[in-house]
């Protein structure tokens, strides 16, 4: 799930990383894994027995998955599994155990700065038309304002909405950094240079949401963002916020 922020009497706080109910993309439509073979479903278990889709991830190679740090942060590695090669969140494809989670050393769980992590599977991911390594933005990959980008995932259709078993996608646009920073500053949140904002500014209705955390934001087929946080979902005034992949290109390469 993507974290969303709730206004509390004493300030602002992030909602817990794993929600009470598993989660979908807001304002999008259903799609198939063959259209997005680089995405995987991350499965979480509270008891070590029953697993459900809780976040998304991105295939880097046949053993490593890129995701948001807030998804596995603080959890034992055996609480998470990876489902690759399936259109559906909780069935099909291949399920892999994990043997390592590497969270960015500068990850800040309060501000969600540097919200990026790499999970290593215990077994190889077999590549086919439903599972492929992603093209990842390099350090010099710059995305301009108002560029068309696509998000995909199994998250909520609205804040607190019902789960989507089938993969969904939505077209949104990149948002000017200064504008995004100013909007969030008005409610006491910090948007850093390590973040990339996307949505349908001043219109709303399209966004990533809970359950989409860790999933990809694509620009011309290149992963430029990892879904991270936002103020609820799909609000006109507040875009979604992603980890900006180009800022972590060297770290990703060195740890995968």
Swiss-Prot record:
Matching InterPro entries: Peptidase_S1, Peptidase_S1_PA, Peptidase_S1_PA_chymotrypsin, Peptidase_S1A, Trypsin_dom, TRYPSIN_HIS, TRYPSIN_SER
Gene3D superfamilies membership: Trypsin-like serine proteases (2.40.10.10)
Entry EC no(s): 3.4.21.4
Cellular component terms per the entry's GO annotation: extracellular region
Matching Pfam families: Trypsin
Keyword terms: Disulfide bond, Hydrolase, Protease, Secreted, Serine protease, Signal, Zymogen
Removed propeptide positions: 18-24
MF-aspect GO terms: serine-type endopeptidase activity
Signal sequence bounds: 1-17
Tissues showing expression: Midgut.
Record-annotated active site: 70, 115, 213
Disulfide bond residue pairs: 55-71, 180-197, 209-233
Enzyme class, broadest EC rank: hydrolase
GO annotation (BP), single: proteolysis
Marked site: Required for specificity: 207
Catalyzed reactions: Preferential cleavage: Arg-|-Xaa, Lys-|-Xaa
Compartment(s) of residence: Secreted, Extracellular space
Family affiliation: Belongs to the peptidase S1 family.
Protein's name in the database: Trypsin, alkaline B
Source organism per UniProt: Manduca sexta (Tobacco hawkmoth)
